[in-house]
UniProtKB/Swiss-Prot annotation:
Documented EC number(s): 5.3.3.2
Presence of the UniProt keyword Metal-binding in the record: yes
Binding site for Mg(2+): 66, 86
Main subcellular location: cytoplasm
Name of the protein in question: Isopentenyl-diphosphate Delta-isomerase
Name of the encoding gene: idi
Function (record text): Catalyzes the 1,3-allylic rearrangement of the homoallylic substrate isopentenyl (IPP) to its highly electrophilic allylic isomer, dimethylallyl diphosphate (DMAPP).
Keywords: Cytoplasm, Isomerase, Isoprene biosynthesis, Magnesium, Manganese, Metal-binding
Amino acid sequence: MPLTEVVLVDENDKPTGVMEKQEAHVKGELHRAITVYIFNSRQQLLLQQRAEEKYHSGGLWSNTCCSHPAPGEETLQAAHRRLYEEMGLRCALTPMFTLTYRLQLDNGLIEHELGHVYFGVTDDVPQINPDEVSSYEYQSIDEITQRMMMTPEQFTAWFQLTFARIPDYWQAFKSEQSR
């Protein structure tokens, strides 16, 4: 069953209510979100191209997956659920950071989210859900950086915003994993 409600939060991530997902994006209400970055053993990031039929940002490239936890669902649980539903992958996920952003999308919707960002590593082959994802590819952080500078219009607004933090967090994640 598709998620229809999001958890509204304050700037400290304390729940303040529940709202229908589309309404929250129309009104620009701050709500909880999850963002997942999956890397392979070659240190390449798994990118997804959003399905054209998505209600916003269809056809654009983005991080491995992102979504919203359901009311009462923990963010880690939501991250695992959406990683499997969108990409057919299961792997350990590590919480890395949170960030709050407000982005006006081209179609008039507003992404006002407090996002919980997770990293994971797997060499499993994605089994994409065509309702969510039209394609995928692995690229190094340097390749993505170059591509984003050349053709930013090919990427989702939130990916462009969060990606700026990824190189430093990836280095910290790798250091922690090698201990």
